[in-house]
């Protein structure tokens, strides 16, 4: 997987890819339309953030590149790549339990709070995409 030079793009499978962790300066793109929704992405080396229709959807510290991000009724799936290990925050349903998979292996079940945010740490340094 490579960084998303255009900051956000639609994939042929109906998913989106976004983020460029190689940028030294913050870049953003607003009003990207996909499947009737409007997305906003901000990305650079220290942070990547995605909003959908003005609501929080994804954030990573430091910055990452995300490919094939897809929402379903059961949750979200995506692949992520970065130069360093990252803390991911994903906006999901409030007060719900999700099973989290990292590199195809279960990392266990995790709960969101009232804000619907799920926090996951992933080892990315030297790993390629996870």
Give the location of each predicted region.
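Surface-exposed beta-strand/loop patches in extracellular or lumenal glycoproteins
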Residues: 79-96
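Activation corresponds to long, low-complexity, non-globular regions
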Residues: 1-30
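Hydrophobic residues positioned within well-ordered beta-strands of beta-sheet architectures
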Residues: 76-78, 100, 130
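C-terminal beta-strand-rich structural cap/linker in extracellular carbohydrate-active enzymes
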Residues: 27-50, 58-60, 86-90, 112-130
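Surface beta-strand/loop "capping" patches
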Residues: 48-83
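Short strand-turn-strand beta-turns centered on an Asx-Gly dipeptide
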Residues: 101-105
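Short, isolated positions in well-ordered beta-strands
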Residues: 17, 23, 39, 57, ...
């Amino acid at each position: 997987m490579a960084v998303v030079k255009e900051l956000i793009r639609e994939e042929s499978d109906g998913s989106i890819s976004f983020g460029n962790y190689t940028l030294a300066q913050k870049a953003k793109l607003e009003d990207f339309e996909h499947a009737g929704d409007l997305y906003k992405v901000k990305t650079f080396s220290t942070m990547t953030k995605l909003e959908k229709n003005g609501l929080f959807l994804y954030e990573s510290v430091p910055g990452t590149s995300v490919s094939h991000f897809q929402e379903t009724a059961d949750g979200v799936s995506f692949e992520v790549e970065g130069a360093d290990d990252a803390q991911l925050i994903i906006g999901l349903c409030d007060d719900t339990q999700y099973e989290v998979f990292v590199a195809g292996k279960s990392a266990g079940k995790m709960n969101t709070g009232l804000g619907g945010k799920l926090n996951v740490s992933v080892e990315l340094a030297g790993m390629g995409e996870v």
